[in-house]
Amino acid sequence: MSFLTTPKMLSEYQCLKNIGFSHKTVLKRRLFRKECTPALKSFYSTQDPALNEVRTEKLKNGVTYVCDPRPGHFSGLGVYVKAGSRYETKKFSGVSHFMDRLAFQATERTPVGEMKAKLENLGGNYMCSTSRESMIYQAAVFNDDVKSMSKLLAETVLAPKIQEDDLVHYRDSIIYENSELWTKPDALLGEFAHVTAFQNNTLGNCLLCTPDKVNGITATSIREYLKYFYRPEHLTLAYAGIPQEIAKEITKELYGHLPSSSLPPLEAIPSHYTGGFMGIKKSEAPPVPYQQEFTHVVIAMEGLPVTDPDIYALACLQFLLGGGGSFSAGGPGKGMYSRLYLNVLNQYPWVETCMAFNHSYTDSGLFGMFVTILDDAAHLAAPLIIRELCNTVLSVTSEETERAKNQLKSSLLMNLESRMISLEDLGRQIQTQNGLYITPKEMIEKIDALTPSDLSRVARRVLTGNVSNPGNGTGKPTVLIHGNVDEVGDVFALCKKAGIGH
């Protein structure tokens, strides 16, 4: 057994691998870690269970922070900003995409070289991503480096250095990213499904900065974006594995000085589900490095927001349908007994991919299926999807319900074993649910309570267009076709005949 994996170190080594630490970093930190302060040493100690409860507090200026103090070998830090593509007006369209390019680069106080050196010396894992409803900044570090990483995180969120010279490089990378999207059908379908389902509003705003808008993004527009969205009341901080008193101290030190914003609150525009059709013929798509021989079809309906009581039933329904690619290594927990594997992928060799999806947001959602099918069989894609969707209303057995519940629970709990994922769950719950945090135990109890009739009921509610969300959606199907558009046929007529949508 190597030095890195002696029994004494095994648990820490495994944990570090899970969040992306390298072998060199583990060894370096083991041999050369500086002595921890008494407060930071307590991260590893067993504490009173009452001290391990998740707590939330709001500063006077509006900054909210939440802390899960349960100790571990490393700690998680996150900043979640109420920003993203759904909040973009015409003036700020595409700016969110530039924000993740600016993360962990030069700041007003730290040159880019020094920033990179500090991050490398910390040896942690850090990231920034843009979603439709949030800008996410996260890091996982050793416990004795929490304060150092917190300062770098605050710098990159509050004071990124924005220079026109740097934007030239970011524009090129964003244009390249847009071109790459056309070579990844899964990502392409997900993005265009939102654009079609919520046309010209909120969740339908493109997550990427489109090529026609790239050159219009300037240093001035980014600074205005920062001023408008990065206000104290829009910031939610999350801490995992950090004692409450240290989390409070860090928050007040780094964010307590921010003045309350004098700007008016963001206009609360509800997400209006429109449904609709988008067809992309091969001749209309940009050229790709290979000849596309598949047609991709999506059929979706308005889903449920994260606060809807039926959200667990709909998530379970997604696992019941399941699906995936035509090739799978198999094995326990792979979903090989889900309906889409049994009824579609294992039956029809001309189906490359068939999968159910479920996206939930603060006030709406998107639920449906997509299939990737050989061009010669394109006319069979829509009937396949509609058949499987309708069967969830007609019949759901106890056996497949229990299987789907177990898969949902295992997926939830295994994901939460990751420090970064549990951190995001903590921060995003507080941000999207007005400070409410639902524990994993409570989620499991809600999943356990589901019955086959619950799944059929929520399937009927969604597929018939009877979802009542704040945006008063149309209840019409969303249909997206990429490939042999004409061969797929009249999908709306098939949906109407099957009773899907209004």
UniProtKB/Swiss-Prot annotation:
Question: How does this chain assemble?
Answer: Heterodimer of mas2 (alpha) and mas1 (beta) subunits, forming the mitochondrial processing protease (MPP) in which mas2 is involved in substrate recognition and binding and mas1 is the catalytic subunit.
Q: Which organism is it from?
A: Schizosaccharomyces pombe (strain 972 / ATCC 24843) (Fission yeast)
Q: Which family does the similarity line name?
A: Belongs to the peptidase M16 family.
What is this protein's name? Probable mitochondrial-processing peptidase subunit alpha
Family annotation (PANTHER family): METALLOPROTEASE, MITOCHONDRIAL-PROCESSING PEPTIDASE SUBUNIT ALPHA
Q: From the Swiss-Prot or TrEMBL record, state where the protein is found.
A: Mitochondrion matrix
Output the lineage of the source organism.
Answer: Eukaryota, Fungi, Dikarya, Ascomycota, Taphrinomycotina
**Chain's role:** Substrate recognition and binding subunit of the essential mitochondrial processing protease (MPP), which cleaves the mitochondrial sequence off newly imported precursors proteins.
Pfam families of this UniProt entry?
Peptidase_M16, Peptidase_M16_C
